[in-house]
């Protein structure tokens, strides 16, 4: 079991990138690793020592690499198990320590200097780094219990508390020059248990356009060092002292570029807000002329460099732009709130009108149903009255025919009566003639008696004939009177029928006019229903059914680029609904 403290980690791909010099600070933490026994262990190769390369990365992705000692008690061979909670990741590719951010120089055992110079190379009096295919073991330790690691090899494992620290250990094969000497004091400044680690990049010599910077790693050692040789009884207690040459200076050029970029973005934000305010109908004069009186140059202290003045100028400009943007945002929200209030009022009015129109439509539909029922009943009554009128007209026609027949029979009877009267006169004249003739020829009582007998018989015959004719005439007269009475009665009934027909025709005309009006209203309603589902027709009369609403909503300018805002100086337009009158005929 061993304890170590690490800061953070970067992968081996980041070792070849040169990072800017910054101060690396971290908090010391102690974690324990347990060896996991391997299934098959093979003896290490001869004349080969396994050297571990540690890679650390700080808060700003600053990379520091260090070599573990040859006499470390940790894993000495890639064939032995690594003290980690993860499986070993093996890669068989050529790997050599050529990093521009880390080179190890020979130094005293108490101090380890790491120079950031790509021109230097690794020189050791006893160790020679050879370029041949190596076997690399990397182990990862993620120390953040609140966040699951991004690496697929670390998911599901136990994490240590910390601030997302990943430690990568690389083991390389290093060929020995002297096989008799396995260790040397010159390379004994290696792995220790760190109690209060602090990595400081201290610039020893800063020149203009110079890329050589020295990084010092200082550590406080609280554990006992490892043995120099396998059988050597002596032990070395090493301490790495912190070398702090003062705070590192920031790059003013980088800071100025950052301020310029922030100023540009702030200006772009202000112009974007101003454009949106113009699109919703706001005024921009109040915002552009408020801060013009402020003199930025008077606020800049004297005696500073031009670069510092420019940075302060950027900061003051950003402050002014931020103030303007704040006022623009507040004005925009006030305009939006006002427009939303107008929209809410118009929406409420439209909903009320919609409810009213729906009620009117329901009422008209009920009226339409009632009118249809009334129309059906009127049609039924009209059919019945027409049938009765046809029957009465047929009866009148039959009565007229009977009257004509009676008139013809009466004329025939009158003609026969005239014939009988004519025959009577002829007989009387003949009787006179016979009397005269008899009186001239026969004068005696027998003739007189015979003449009286013939006269009496003739008188009886005439009397009987007259009685028969009188009875027949009286009978015919009674029949004629009866016919006349019947005709008069029938004529009175016909006049009653005609009066009733006149009343019915007037009632029918009124019903027809009512039906016509109702059919017009029905056609209007049907046209409204049809126009509500389809586009309104072109013809017809136009009626205003809604109230006056606002037709301009500047808030819509935020949604549509082609929206044209009209100032509220003009009168509000009126929304109308076109209705088309179509005549609807009854089936």
Curated annotation (Swiss-Prot):
Location(s) in or outside the cell: Cell junction, Tight junction
Keyword Coiled coil: yes
Tissues showing expression: Expression absent in adult ovary.
Example GO BP: epithelial cell morphogenesis
Superkingdom per UniProt: Eukaryota
UniProt GO molecular function: actin filament binding
Natural source organism: Mus musculus
Annotated Gene Ontology cellular component terms: actin filament; adherens junction; bicellular tight junction; desmosome
Pfam families in the cross-refs: POF1B_HlH (PF24617)
Entries under InterPro entries matching the protein: POF1B (IPR026186), POF1B_HlH (IPR056240)
Protein's UniProt name: Protein POF1B
Keywords: Actin-binding, Cell junction, Coiled coil, Tight junction
Coiled coil, from the record: 331-529
Role description: Plays a key role in the organization of epithelial monolayers by regulating the actin cytoskeleton. May be involved in ovary development.
Record's keyword annotation contains Hydrolase: no
Subunit structure: Interacts with nonmuscle actin.
């Amino acid at each position: 079991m061993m304890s170590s403290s690490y800061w953070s980690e970067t992968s081996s791909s980041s070792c070849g990138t040169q990072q800017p010099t910054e101060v690396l600070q971290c908090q010391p933490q102690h974690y324990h690793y347990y060896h996991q026994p391997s299934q098959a262990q093979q003896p290490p190769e001869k004349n080969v020592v396994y050297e571990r390369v540690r890679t650390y990365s700080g808060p700003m992705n600053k990379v520091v690499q260090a070599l573990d000692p040859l006499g470390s008690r940790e894993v000495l061979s890639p064939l032995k198990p690594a003290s980690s909670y993860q499986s070993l990741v093996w890669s068989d590719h050529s790997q050599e320590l050529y990093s521009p951010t880390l080179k190890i120089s020979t130094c005293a055992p108490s101090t380890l200097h790491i120079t950031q110079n790509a021109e230097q190379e690794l020189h050791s009096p006893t160790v020679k780094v050879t370029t041949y295919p190596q076997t690399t073991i990397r182990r990862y330790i993620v120390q953040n219990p609140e966040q699951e690691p991004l690496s697929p090899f670390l998911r599901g494992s136990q994490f240590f508390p910390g601030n997302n620290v990943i430690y990568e250990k690389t083991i390389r094969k290093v060929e020995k020059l002297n096989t008799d000497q396995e260790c040397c004091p010159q390379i004994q400044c290696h792995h220790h248990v760190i109690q209060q680690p602090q990595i400081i990049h201290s610039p020893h010599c800063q020149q203009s356009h110079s890329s050589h910077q020295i990084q010092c790693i200082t550590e406080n050692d609280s554990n006992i060092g490892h043995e120099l040789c396998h059988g050597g009884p002596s032990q070395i207690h090493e301490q790495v002292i912190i070398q702090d040459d003062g705070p590192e200076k920031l790059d003013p050029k980088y800071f100025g570029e950052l301020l310029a970029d922030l100023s540009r973005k702030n200006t772009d934000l202000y112009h974007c807000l101003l454009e949106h305010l113009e699109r919703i109908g706001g005024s921009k004069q109040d915002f552009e002329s408020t801060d013009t009186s402020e003199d930025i140059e008077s606020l800049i202290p004297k005696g500073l460099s031009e670069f510092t003045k420019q940075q302060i100028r950027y900061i003051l400009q950003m402050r002014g732009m931020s103030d303007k943007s704040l006022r623009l945002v507040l004005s925009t929200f006030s305009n939006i709130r006002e427009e939303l209030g107008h929209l809410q009022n118009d929406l409420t009015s439209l909903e009320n009108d919609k409810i009213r129109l729906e009620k009117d439509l329901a009422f008209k539909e009920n009226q339409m149903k009632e009118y249809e029922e009334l129309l059906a009943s009127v049609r039924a009554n009209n059919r019945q009255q027409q049938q009765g009128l046809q029957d009465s007209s047929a009866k009148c026609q039959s009565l007229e025919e009977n009257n004509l027949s009676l008139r013809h029979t009466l004329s025939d009877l009158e003609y026969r009566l005239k014939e009988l009267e004519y025959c009577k006169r002829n007989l009387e004249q003949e009787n006179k003639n016979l009397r005269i003739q008899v009186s001239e020829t026969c004068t005696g009582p027998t003739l007189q008696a015979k003449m009286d007998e013939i006269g009496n018989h003739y008188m009886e015959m005439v009397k009987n004939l007259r009685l028969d004719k009188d009875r027949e005439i009286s009978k015919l007269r009674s029949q004629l009177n009866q016919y006349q009475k019947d005709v008069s009665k029938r004529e009175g009934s016909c006049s009653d029928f005609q009066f009733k027909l006149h009343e019915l025709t007037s009632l029918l005309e009124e019903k027809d006019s009512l039906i016509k009006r109702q059919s017009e209203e029905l056609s209007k309603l049907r046209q409204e229903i049809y126009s509500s589902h389809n586009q309104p027709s072109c013809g017809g009369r136009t009626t205003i059914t809604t109230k006056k609403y606002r037709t301009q909503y500047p808030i819509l300018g935020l949604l549509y680029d082609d929206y044209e805002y009209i100032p509220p100086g003009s009168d509000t337009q009126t929304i109308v609904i076109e209705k088309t009158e179509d005549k609807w005929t009854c089936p």
